[in-house]
């Protein structure tokens, strides 16, 4: 139980910032788009925009960042020490029917958050990012 409290206390200062980032990140329609796919945007412009959002966030926070052709963004605390690799994706599946609100607008209902990508995989990606930010040396 003490470890849980330790990590909750470590994350608490970032909660408001993370929610703002999640809202902005979710708002990016990053469904694979064959029509906007080209050499600079291998998965379409929306996916590239989502990857660039993460890239810019990490650069702003002082991380070493490499964007490999809008396919992979690597975030490092340094380039010398061994690193832990966390893999996540910034694209989302196409929007289906039945959404009671805009699927790219973060909606809070009670203790739950709803939007395309909250659980797969934009929310977890940002959780890992803010964990890295909180724990970095």
Label the predicted regions.
Residues 2-118, 135-137:
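Acidic/His- and Gly-rich active-site-bordering loop/insert found
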